[in-house]
């Protein structure tokens, strides 16, 4: 019985130690969430403004033949996949990698996030770069550099389409693995936008097509950076939720173990009293 009580006591200490770690990770994730949410909120208007600008340019010259708008047969796709740099975030990594794994056809992958790189190296998928890009540390400048490489490869015909797979941050409790088509652009101006473009006095120099092409790298960089911001916020929210659940489970386990310990201790005391009484009667 003494051995059993000692084992229970050791297990209680082990669970308490684990609970301290999960609680600390929950607090760290919570403290980083405010900044991550601000980045998401600030990145969305940039993308929306660029998309609106491109739509206006396309509406002003609907006959323009731009390589970023063409719809040739898609034989090879560049797939940008954003996952986390660490685990302990519930189903965050597995959900986005499962979403990416559903992509059909020939692909070359640009992984962002350590877990994304490890996954595609393990599955021997052709990679756009051998450099491991950490999702939590990638900067705006690096996104612009990637954008230039991506658009250059697209113009050269190294791939016929560009897609991005990331986790959209809906709320603290909801994050959704999403695939978005980046290139070629899906821009269909409405009749109202076309009418407004005809009435507009805007002149594009040297030409609307060249201005359109010049904006594309900015647009792609905005998508990549925005998707990274959304994914980082989603990872932190998922980790906070997972660590909160783990902390609560650890607390419940400690309560149960304390109950078992008290029962074992009571049984040991009862046995000692019984033995003393039996010895006295003899």
Give the role of each language-model region:
Residues 1-282:
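C-terminal beta-strand-loop-alpha-helix "lid" module of Rossmann-like NAD(P)-dependent dehydrogenases
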């Amino acid at each position: 019985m003494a051995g059993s009580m000692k084992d229970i006591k050791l297990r209680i200490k082990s669970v308490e130690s684990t609970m301290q770690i999960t609680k600390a990770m929950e607090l760290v994730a919570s403290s980083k969430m405010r900044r991550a949410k601000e980045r998401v909120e600030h990145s969305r208007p940039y993308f929306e403004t660029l998309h609106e600008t491109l739509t206006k340019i396309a509406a002003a010259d609907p006959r323009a033949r731009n390589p970023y708008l063409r719809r040739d047969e898609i034989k090879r796709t560049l797939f940008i996949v954003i996952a986390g740099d660490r685990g302990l975030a519930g189903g965050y990594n597995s959900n986005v990698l499962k979403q990416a794994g559903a992509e059909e056809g020939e692909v070359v992958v640009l992984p962002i996030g350590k877990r994304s790189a490890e996954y595609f190296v393990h599955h021997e998928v052709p990679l756009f770069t051998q450099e491991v890009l950490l999702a939590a540390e990638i900067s705006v400048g690096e996104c612009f550099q990637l954008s230039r490489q991506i658009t250059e490869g697209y113009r050269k015909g190294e791939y016929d389409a560009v897609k991005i797979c990331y986790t959209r941050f809906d709320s603290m409790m909801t994050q959704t693995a999403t695939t978005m088509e980046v290139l070629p652009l899906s821009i269909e101006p409405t009749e109202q936008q076309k009418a407004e473009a005809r009435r507009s006095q805007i002149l594009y120099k040297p030409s609307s097509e060249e201005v359109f092409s010049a904006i594309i790298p900015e647009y792609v960089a905005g998508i990549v950076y925005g998707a990274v911001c959304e994914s980082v916020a989603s990872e932190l929210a998922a980790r906070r939720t997972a660590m909160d659940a783990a902390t609560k489970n650890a607390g419940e386990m400690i309560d149960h173990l304390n109950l078992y310990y008290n029962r074992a201790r009571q049984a040991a005391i009862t046995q000692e009293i019984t033995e003393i009484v039996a010895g006295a009667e003899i």
